[in-house]
A protein has these predicted regions:
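Nucleotide-activated chemistry modules centered on ATP-dependent adenylation/adenylyltransferase
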Residues: 1-157
Length: 157
């Protein structure tokens, strides 16, 4: 079984990755979907995280240009989820190269209602009862601060 980490770069997926490594859970691949529209601090965070873990984070690019999609479809929303569709499509294509696989998703214990009971997905932070607050504190204690983004915003990825 291939273990693939889906890394948004935010506090929850970062904490999940670091905790999995700390708990010696096998990590085969780490994928980050680079929209090209992320905060510069987020890209710096991904670079720093890559150095910290001493391994590669695969950076996936969108199939379509986001500026063109935005012009065509407008803001991504709950009803019009073109951004999510691009991200999921790219990540699923990557994962499907490594069947059988388990995809690890960084939903916190606070977000457990978002979980879909689908085979092939694992939500360690929910299993470990790690809240969003716990995840942020854990990351900050490890020296990850996203250049202060979490001081300004609740969500950064």
């Amino acid at each position: 079984m291939t273990n693939i980490i889906s890394l948004s770069g935010g506090k929850d997926s970062t904490a999940m990755l670091l905790m999995m490594i700390e708990k010696k859970i096998k990590v085969d691949h780490i994928v980050f979907f680079d929209t090209g529209w992320d905060f510069p601090e987020m890209i710096e965070h991904i670079d720093k995280l890559e150095k910290y873990i001493g391994g590669e984070i695969t950076r996936l690019k969108p199939k379509h240009n986001f500026k063109e999609l935005f012009t065509k479809w407008g803001f991504s929303s709950f009803k019009n989820r073109w951004c999510t569709a691009e991200k999921r499509g790219a990540i699923n294509k990557f994962c499907n190269q490594y069947k059988p696989f388990t995809q690890y998703i960084g939903f916190s214990f606070d977000e457990r209602q978002r979980i879909k009971k689908t085979m092939g997905y694992c939500y360690p932070l929910v299993d470990w009862k790690v809240t969003e607050e716990d995840a942020l504190k854990y990351c900050l204690d490890k020296g990850f601060d996203w250049g202060g983004l979490y001081e300004k915003y609740n969500r950064v990825s």
